Every structure is written in C-alpha cells, then in structure tokens.
UniProtKB/Swiss-Prot annotation:
Coiled coil: none annotated. GO terms for cellular component: cytoplasm. HAMAP family: 16SrRNA_methyltr_H. This is Ribosomal RNA small subunit methyltransferase H. Belongs to the methyltransferase superfamily. RsmH family. The keyword Metal-binding does not apply. InterPro entries: RsmH, SAM-dep_MeTrfase_MraW_recog, SAM-dependent_MTases_sf. One of its GO terms (biological process) is rRNA base methylation.
C-alpha cells in the first residue's frame, strides 16, 4: 500500500509494493492456507494464488467496501474475502485451524488516496471522511467537531509526530466558534489551509499538512490498535514453520512490528531481570518462538518506478516449534 501524500499518476496506480519479495517470503508450501490481511486491490492476493496448488487456500481481509467489490472479480474456489479488519482474523478463522502464512501490507492504497470523496489526501478537495470502512464509524470531520483540544493535540502529536500539535489543535477548536465561513472543519482543503497557518516551519519536500492527515487517519481507523491485535492473532494462527510478513510505511507501524517480532525471537532479553540473575541454565529461560528472516527495502528500480514505495519496510519471521520440556517443567538441554 502507501503512506498518505502525493497523488498517483495513472502509471502509478495499483502498483503493489515489494510484490515478488513478499510472496517469495510468504509462500513456502503450495498446499497451505494463507491470509492476506490487507487485500487492497488484490496485487498480493493474485500473486499468492498463482503460487498455490489445487489444495491451497487464501483468505483475504479488508475494511474497504471498494476492496470487497474488487475481490468479487476473482473467480477462484481457493479464494475467499472477509469484510473486516485483519485484527478480527482469529475470530473469523477459528474453525480453519492453523495457517501457513499471514501477510499484512499496512497503510493506505493509491486508489484510496486518489479518490477525493474518501478525504484521505490534502491534495484533493473533498469531505474530510478518512474512514477505510465507509459503512461504519465516525468521520474525521465528525471527530474534530466534538473532540476536546487536549485529545486532538495528543492524536496529532502521538500519531503524526507533529511538533506543532498543540498549535494545530488550538486552531481547530477556535475555528468551531468562528462566524461566517468558520465553524467545524468539513473538508480536506479546510484542514490543510488551517494547518499551513499553524505550522511555523516546514520540512523540505513535505507539505505541512502531511503529519496531521496521517495522524487523523490512524486515529479514525484505529490502525495501530488493529496492528497490535492483528500481530497477536497472526502469531497464534501460524503453524510451525509458518511465515509472518509485514510491510509498513512509517516509523510508528514499523516500531510495533519490530518490537513484536523481537519479543518472540529474543525473549531472554525481555525476561525479568531477577529471572536472568537466578542460577538457571539458558534453556530454563524463555525460548524463542519466532525466527527473524530479514528486513527488506524496495530497490532503486522499484522506487524509481513507484516513488510511494520509498518508505516501505518489510519484516519477515518464521514460527518455531515450542521448546520441549522435561517432566519438571524445564526445557531439555
């Protein structure tokens, strides 16, 4: 997918980031059941299906009704789609047993950015919606019209890493009571103009509204909460040898993914210090349950062809068998 920002030219539409690398890392047995947690416009799903044998299966998830409609064009008995967040995969797949791999391609897709009515981009005039699932939840405009100044500042600071969050929040709240053309912010252009006045210094090559739009999108869609829930669900669903492949587009996402994988790959580092000081064998400490298989970035050719891929980071991990234990509960040496 992609971060919020520059509009796509027609040549850049529907370009799936790290397509071959992600599918190579994900599919290790052609008869396995796989999960594409973010169908989008189906780039990864179609490539996974091409790798599967007749007994393989792919279950995709997406919040976006437009993605669900696109999934309907795939006529393959091995494929099914769930209109839900990938955070719900544990409940939705409870009767299918373990899976061979889970792919999460985070962020927002080019078609979502480029459709003005969705309200994701400051470069297109449109209603300030920002919901990935337009059938439920409140819009960004509705939230900004009712949230207090402290909450708005917190969201913009924490999710947008915006140092002018307080000034932006003050301006948003003050705008509600302005006469004439004032009142609650309703459009992308309204918000972009307000932020441009509140942000005193500008980062080179970045619109001053970039961080605020990112923050509101993350908040409205509960993206980081969904990511944490989805990682836990994926881990529980994976069979031994199963692959977890996650593509992120900004530091907040990547930090969560990195910490989650590291906690399962190097649990001894996170063990209670008192436990680490106790006279125990290394085998008696928490044992790894994931193996880190690498961190990947798009190459120069992909970035040149698709500038939105520049910030992508892909992390891959493999589920390990639980350590065998003795009758007394300690791990066998």
């Amino acid at each position: 997918m992609s971060p919020t920002g520059t509009p796509a030219t027609p040549a850049l539409r529907h370009r799936t980031v790290l397509l071959d690398e992600a599918v190579d890392a994900l599919v290790w047995r052609p008869d396995g059941v796989y999960v594409d947690g973010t169908f989008g416009r189906g780039g990864h799903s179609r490539a996974v299906l091409a790798r599967l044998g007749p007994d393989g299966a792919l279950v995709a998830f997406d919040k976006d009704p437009a993605a669900i409609a696109e999934a309907g064009t795939i006529k393959d008995a091995r494929f099914s789609i769930e209109h839900a967040s990938f955070a719900a995969m544990a409940e939705r797949l409870s009767g299918r047993g373990h899976v061979a791999g889970v792919l999460l391609d985070l962020g927002i897709s080019s078609p979502q950015i480029d459709e003005a009515a969705r309200g994701f981009s400051f470069r297109f005039e449109g209603p300030l919606d920002m919901r990935m699932d337009t059938t439920r939840g409140i819009t960004a405009a509705q939230w900004l019209a009712q949230a207090d100044e402290q909450d708005i500042a917190r969201v913009i600071r924490d999710y947008g890493e915006e140092r002018f969050a307080v000034q932006i929040a003050k301006a948003i709240v003050a705008r509600r009571s302005e006469p004439g053309d004032g009142g609650p912010i309703a459009t992308t252009a309204d918000l972009a103009a307000l932020v441009a006045k509140a942000v005193k210094t500008r980062e080179k090559g970045q619109d001053p509204a970039t961080r605020t739009f990112q923050a509101l999108r993350i908040h409205v869609n509960q993206e980081l909460e969904d990511l944490e829930r989805g990682l836990k669900a994926a881990y529980e669903l994976l069979q031994v040898g199963g692959r977890l492949v996650v593509i992120s587009f900004h530091s907040l996402e990547d930090r969560i993914v990195k910490r989650f994988m590291a906690a399962h790959a190097r649990p001894q580092q996170d063990a209670d210090p008192a436990l680490r000081r106790a006279p125990l064998r290394a085998a008696d400490l928490p044992q790894p349950t994931l193996r880190l298989l690498g961190r990947y970035k798009p190459g120069p050719e992909e970035v040149a062809a698709n500038p939105r891929a520049r910030s992508a980071v892909m992390r891959v991990a493999e589920k390990l068998a639980p350590a065998a234990t003795t009758a007394g509960g300690g791990a066998r040496a």
